[in-house]
Structures are given as structure tokens and as C-alpha cells.
């Protein structure tokens, strides 16, 4: 076990505070509409330019182990805020740094850290209650677009794309953000369920111009195993031919005699049929086939359930109004599944999303949820250069999460004003002792910092701006740093999602309170590099060169 270095008390807190300040100074410059960019060096490729607080925070790793611990704790605030609300990472970092700085001063002055923490917790509870009380529900598309615009640093085009996407796929639908190959940013909405498997054979194509299979009012056979023998399929094929409807087969694979027969029948025109490989692998494939079965009102044919293919009847097949299959994707539109069954399945997937601890599983479950709940919207972000596209994609991601949060919990006036107004309500809080009162005062002071920093980034005097805002009692009255005017921020479209503001203060106070109550820090002592590459000194034991004269 390697040696450890231990720091105590004021020494520990000073080193930690230095790390917090370094991270805070790098992140705070990005806050607000006039926030600056930060350039991040990459080990390969061009440097990355971003205005996203959490992206900057994630890049920071300090050489001094003790300073690094402080920086990493505050980085956690930004990451947690991004995970929970998708935005507000810079605000959370500014709040955390302010609480830590003021708290460390109070501890150094001899106050009880645990009472300070209790005071901080009481203050945060009061602030959250005030935010929730003043929150306004989001209903119109204009308001959704405004939230997206603010979060994308004033880019109205991004706000409109997100508003359109949410209008088309609903608030629950999945919106994915990709990099486009062109200059333009575009929105594409895939209705119904789409999965990334195309036709097994091009001979199934019905629309030769688009190289696509298009089938209306089709039966859907969902089979878990491979299909290779024809005899097990025959009874079903005869029933489908008599019905006169097309048939789509989704199976692990279709090969050999079965595939040859289907292709021949398709070419001769006796049977409208197409075969597709099942999406996913293993247990996820079973779950996705079950989703398709519920969506189309059919049954997944599986040996686990004791159903054999030769015993399948027409009423066990799914139905869909339209099925489109191209080389890479299959889309099922308007399946005939019962609404109650689909809703029950959606509720089941939501429960699994809540329980899972894996980010990958959560992402896959959310995709499945969206496919059942009404479609997927894809925003393709364009730009002139790769650096520009990446920077814009960051902002679209932020804006999308913020918009979701706004729909969930409502909106508040932006520009740090909601926190500033909440700070006024902390003056009357009753505490058990003076140290707890100081804890409340620390939070009250910290709540003015986001508004102050937004003004500073716009080249104004933060203290003057904050003072002028607090002179007026109107809740939404604040400073628009984009235009340099005061007024009603909500009517100007400067708004923040309640969830983003709430999560920012809760996470900031949680981590800051832990840092304030820290009394000792332990870090590994860096190993001294001898520079000899592991060989013993003195040339690694090689003898003299024995009379080798040159």
C-alpha cells in the first residue's frame, strides 16, 4: 500500500477551496446570454469550443491531489444537475462555490460546522418551497420554444426545432440529437415504431424507385426463432393467401428453403410478403418482440410459451395499417394493439427505467418507451465546421433537457431572479442558535451570485444590477443582459425551468455543506520518478568493456 499524505482543519479546507475556486473560475465565465466560450484541448483532433458548464467542469483535473478533491466535489454538483435536469450546471457550480467560500470563512471564525450545515439545509428547504409556489405551468408551444431558446444561449432556431419536435412526438416521446452532414439543421419525425433492421432480401421490394417495401393493412408474424423449414410455415401462408392481405415476418432469421419459397411466391405475385430480422439481441430482443406484439395486437411466437409455428392461426398475428421496410429500417405505423395493453406496457417500462442503475439500459428502455408512446424525433444539427457542429449540438442537448424539465415542473423568471427573490424570504427564518442563523445567511448571500455573475459576464457591475432588481417588488422584474434593459423577464421570454433552478440549489447546497464539514483530507503521496526506467543504478550491472580499444 502506498504512503498517504494527510491534511487537517484550516490547511485541508484552504487547499480544497483553492481547487473549488479554479473549477468555479473556469465554469462561471459561461453563464448567461453574454457568457464567454471556453476552449478545451483534446489529446487528438482540433480543440473543442464550448459554452456548456458541465463540459468544462468534466475536463478539469488538477495536479495537486487536495485541490483536485475540492474541484471534483464541485464537478459532481454540475454532473448531478445535468443528469437530473439537463441544464443549470453553471448556476449550480456558482452557488456551490459561493456557499463553500462563505462557509469556510465562518468555520475559520470558530463556528460549529454541523450547525452551519443545519442552517444551510433549513434555508434550502425554504427556497425550494418558494420556487415551487411561484412556478408557472408551461402550456403553449411559444413558451416551450422560449425555454429552448434561453437554454441554447439565445438561439431562437434551436428553440423552435425543439418546440416542433415535442409537438409532434409528445412530451414523453424520444428526441434524439445527431450531427448532420450538411450546413442546415433539420428535424425528422418517425411516426409509429421504427427499429434498425431492413429487409432480408431485396426481392421483397414493392416500390422499386425508393427501394422500399410498402404494405398497407398487413398481418405481422412475430417469431423468436429462425425460420428455415417450409413445412412449419405452410398452414399459415395458405390462410394469409386466402385473406388477401400482405404478410410481414419478423424472425431471428429467415433462410434456406423458407426464404427461397417466400421470394418465389412474392415474385410470382401470389403472396405479398416480406421478411425482416428481429431487432436487438438476447433478452432485449425478447422484450422488443413483445413490444411489437403488444403494439400490433398479436402474439410473439415463442417456444417458452409452448406455441409452435405450425399451430399458429390468423388471429394470433399482429395487424398494422402500414408497414414500410427499407434496406436499414422497418417502420410499423398504427398497429392494431389495444390502448389499455399499450398503456400497461408503457407503465411497466417506466418502472424499469426508475429501477435500473445502468445508463446504457436506461437509454435503451427510453428508446423502447418512445417507440410505444408515439414516435421518435431526430434533430440533425448542421454547421460549417466540425467544431461548430459539436458546439451547437451541446447547446441543442442542453435546450432539449431544459425544455423537458419546464414541461414537467413549470417555469420561473430567468436571469437568476427567482433565486434572488427567494433570498428575500430567508430573512425571517427562525433558528435555534446564531451558528444556524449564519448558515441561513450563507445561503441568502449565495443566492445573489448567479444574477451577479450574469451581469458581470455582460460587462456590468453585478452589485448595482442586483440592488436595482431588489428595489422593485414585482416577482418577474429583472435585468435583461442581452439588451441591457430592466423589465418583466417572463413577458420578455427570459425564463428558467423550475426543476433546473430547484436541482441547482439542492445539489449545490448538498455538496457545499459536505465540504464545509470536512476536517481531514487523505491523498496518496505521488511516487518519485527516478528516471532510470526500473534498472538498478550504475548501468544495470554491466561490467567494464574489457580492453576494447578503438
UniProtKB/Swiss-Prot annotation:
Say what the protein does: Together with its co-chaperonin GroES, plays an essential role in assisting protein folding. The GroEL-GroES system forms a nano-cage that allows encapsulation of the non-native substrate proteins and provides a physical environment optimized to promote and accelerate protein folding.
Factors inducing expression:
Not induced by heat shock.
- Catalytic reaction equation(s): ATP + H2O + a folded polypeptide = ADP + phosphate + an unfolded polypeptide
Which SUPFAM superfamilies does the protein's record reference?
GroEL apical domain-like, GroEL equatorial domain-like, GroEL-intermediate domain like
According to the lineage, what is the superkingdom? Bacteria
Q: How does it assemble?
A: Forms a cylinder of 14 subunits composed of two heptameric rings stacked back-to-back. Interacts with the co-chaperonin GroES.
Question: Which EC number(s) does UniProt give?
Answer: 5.6.1.7
Tell me the protein's name.
Answer: Chaperonin GroEL 2
| UniProt family annotation | Belongs to the chaperonin (HSP60) family.
Q: Does the keyword Nucleotide-binding apply?
A: yes
The compartments listed are: Cytoplasm
GO BP terms: namely: chaperone cofactor-dependent protein refolding; protein refolding; response to heat
* Any one GO MF annotation of this record: ATP binding
Q: What class of enzyme is it?
A: isomerase
